[in-house]
């Protein structure tokens, strides 16, 4: 990923998307012609294409320390989330779900179709761990859903104790790790895991779903065996190869990159806290290394985002789950900041100190123009 989307724009919205990581770009442009064949056929080119797809899947599995046949490529965004939740519940005799109240908007909306219980959060967007565990014990749902970290403010959730209780009660836990950008070790405290490759420099369009072998999953789509019975469609193999290649490249320098970005976020937090009327959101310590959100009291978020864009910075504003729209965030509302627009910064992998300093200057100038 690059800090600049062009000669003038610095990408401070890397969680949404950004330029391709070099190894991903190479995969898309240098693969042999057979990479574009249907991998389900029996002729030579098809078998060769299948080997490329299997290799990409295996490389992802090795990094996540799972088996290749537990890794599937699925549609990104709301379509993929719906596929996951529907597939898990379709395999269950009951339809009770426990989730946090600050999951992605698509998850919250999908859960309205089922018997769901949403667990409250504090003013940093961390769930009430005690309440979550008590509800697991009393309701005994067929599925628990919990984000690895919040998609808007970066706060990490207490995954381990929740997973431990789910294991005791034989309840599958679906962990949405789509905002970790490959920078955080997601460990093994989950039964179902979702990753978003576009956040680490792979092309937009496919997400990575990992379902452990002991977890029941029955796709709502016609099951023809493709993608480990999760998604009945041919996968664009160059994209799958790009996902695997970019994750491998990131994994080689993950610790160094995460540490560098965490320091920059700390510097940015300290600078923002000195600016009048700015409230910095999320946990200052237990957080994603590359994400920071803040709101500016009585200031329109759209105005800030547009003016920062004019000054060369791409940021996200409003609800991060709502495409191209400035709408109040359900996450901020749950945190105690109803009807407030906010700015989310998510740093690209090669963001540097000068970028942070320039951003603070641009933001200060924007506020002075109000």
In which residue ranges do the predicted regions lie?
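Pyridoxal 5′-phosphate
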Residues: 1-370
């Amino acid at each position: 990923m690059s800090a600049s989307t062009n000669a003038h724009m610095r990408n401070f919205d890397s969680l949404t998307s950004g330029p391709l990581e070099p190894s991903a770009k190479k995969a898309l442009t240098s693969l042999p012609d057979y990479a574009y064949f249907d991998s389900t056929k029996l002729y030579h080119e098809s078998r060769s294409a299948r080997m490329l797809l299997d290799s990409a899947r295996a490389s992802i599995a090795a990094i996540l320390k799972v088996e290749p046949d537990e890794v599937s490529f699925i549609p990104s965004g709301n379509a993929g989330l719906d596929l996951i939740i529907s597939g898990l519940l379709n395999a269950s005799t009951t339809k009770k779900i426990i989730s946090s109240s600050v999951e992605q908007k698509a998850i919250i909306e999908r859960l309205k179709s089922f018997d769901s219980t949403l667990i409250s959060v504090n003013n940093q967007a961390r769930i009430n761990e005690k309440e979550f565990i008590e509800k697991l014990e009393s309701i005994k749902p067929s599925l628990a859903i919990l984000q690895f970290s919040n998609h808007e403010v970066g706060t990490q959730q207490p995954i381990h104790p929740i997973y431990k209780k789910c294991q005791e009660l034989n309840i599958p836990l679906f962990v949405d790790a789509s905002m970790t950008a490959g920078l955080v070790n997601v460990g093994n405290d989950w039964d179902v895991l979702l990753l978003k490759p576009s956040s680490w420099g792979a092309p937009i369009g496919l997400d990575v779903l990992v379902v452990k072998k002991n977890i029941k999953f029955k796709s709502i789509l016609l099951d023809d065996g493709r993608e480990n019975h999760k998604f009945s469609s041919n996968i664009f193999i160059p994209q799958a190869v790009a996902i695997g290649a970019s994750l491998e490249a990131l994994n080689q320098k993950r610790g160094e990159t995460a540490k560098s970005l965490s320091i920059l976020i700390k510097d940015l937090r300290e600078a923002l806290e000195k600016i009048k009327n700015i409230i910095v959101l999320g946990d200052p310590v237990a957080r994603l290394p590359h994400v920071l959100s803040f709101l500016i009291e009585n200031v329109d978020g759209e105005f800030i985002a547009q003016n920062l864009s004019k000054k060369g910075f791409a940021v996200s504003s409003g609800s991060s789950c709502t495409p191209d729209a400035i709408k109040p965030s359900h996450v901020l509302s749950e945190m105690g900041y109803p009807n407030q627009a906010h700015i989310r910064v998510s740093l690209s992998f090669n963001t540097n100190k000068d970028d942070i300093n320039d951003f603070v200057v641009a933001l200060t100038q924007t506020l002075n123009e109000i």
